[in-house]
Amino acid sequence: QKTAYEIPKRDWSSDVCSSDLLNFMYDRADLTADRLITYRQICVQVARELGIEVTFMPKPTVGIMGNGCHHNLSLWKDGANAFADPGRRELHITDTAMAALGGLLEHAAESMAVYASTVNSYKRYWDAGQFAPSRVDWGLDDRSRSVRVSASGRLELKLPDSIVNPYLSHALIAAALEDGLARGIDPGPAPEPGVPGPERFAPLPLTLGDAVERFATSAWVRGALGDDLTDLYAEFKRDEWARFCGAVTDWEMTMYRSWVP
């Protein structure tokens, strides 16, 4: 299907509570990034005209699934998907895809300041049981993992949220895939569903402050984005984190206002 704005979409459905789920048809990374930016702007404008509000806030409500932006990806060469074996019917990925997957997992922690770019982003990972992963792992059609083989020849990265900058996330994903292929990084076996796997890779930072430091001190990130962009992005995010740390929240008032030690 195509919209009037030439944004190809595969399907749309009502997700949980007041959330909606839209799947874009796969395309080149740059075009998909353009379409995501355009689509979010369209949503805001249409909501304004209808007198309602749309939010892409990653975690607006506790106990309910947040707003994710799962990135489904594959690599193609000469019109063929390098992540799938032609004619093979069972759920699978190729050795090429395994190495690319290894790169995604290897660099997941360093990329979190982009995948989850706000203070609120990390509330998705702390609210257990909502299919937002908090470990660096993968699985075959396992929605609890940070990377899921959702179909033969396709990887689904579940870490990014709906406020993500797709140009930055796509740049880091491409760099991670490239490094995985170049080094032949082994992602290890997929754990059984519902069973925590071994910690083969650096753990995810679970606050924006930790994520920014991992990002800013990563030689790999600097190689992917360049020093100028890395430093500028880190400066903005450190400021955001500092302002949050200096704010007094409703939770603190409820917890400590009447506290008598």
What name fits each language-model region?
Residues 1-16:
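Single conserved hydrophobic/aromatic residue that forms the stacking wall/gate
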Residues 2, 6, 21, 156, ...:
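Acidic-residue sensor for enzyme active/binding pockets
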Residues 14-38:
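Active-site acidic/histidine clusters and adjacent loop/turn architecture
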Residues 15, 115-119, 226-231:
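Short coil/turn segments at secondary-structure boundaries
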Residues 30-201:
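Active-site capping/gating regions of soluble enzymes
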Residues 193-261:
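Acidic, glycine-enriched catalytic cores built around paired aspartates
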